[in-house]
């Protein structure tokens, strides 16, 4: 139901733009990568590809019932997204913004594997909220490394993980504070959101770990055998991929570079929940800028739907489905 909220908000905005005479496309995609997808597929005994195919069919059926007017609803597990993710990664690498680092990472000795974000739970290192995953806190929206979790427990085995070294790739976000500030000053952002972003910018802006170790469901990083793009590297690129897919369907593929080049007059707006604000307003704009691609003109952020006083969350089983709600 939380996802339907932002789809409905966007739908209202898009319909207004169309009524006003503006040429407006409504583009979206299913986030199809990451540890939760892999775990769920393993649990029910099907491949991740089959799982995301089934989920997308259900989502499209639900959107039809709510009369959501997407021009294209794609998936991040697509040839277009793989192509664009590799393109952006290579551009960032060419700009000297990708760096290898040896990091300490949680390792499950029972399962003999490194534990990526959703394989581990513990207390948030910022606000002490219980039952938080290893990448970001659903309570305070902080992002962090899984090793920083307090009292970590492996989701897979229930054991206490040990610490081992692994080589990871980092996007040098710490060097790009001025670029983020410049984008923020020239974008349409709600004042409370702007204040939160300025708070983050005044703090310790850290380089961003964009790689994950095998096993992981996602795109392999070019040139690395057992490394995958972290889901939040390729997920927002899915907007561009959905547009490229739309253009291909309409035999307009050559328009992509004209629309998405850094000097394009096209306007781009996002509607998101506040839990993913960090990724959309700090990482994504400078990923695009340093790839010579158009940055968003604005980001509209909504708060959480709650159930029994807690954030509605599908991954935690605390939610009302959009299908049940409409029935």
Task: For each feature predicted by the language model, list its residue ranges.
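Structured secondary-structure scaffolds
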Residues: 1-28, 75, 80-84, 127, ...
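N-terminal, positively charged nucleic-acid-binding surface of large information/translation enzymes
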Residues: 1-181
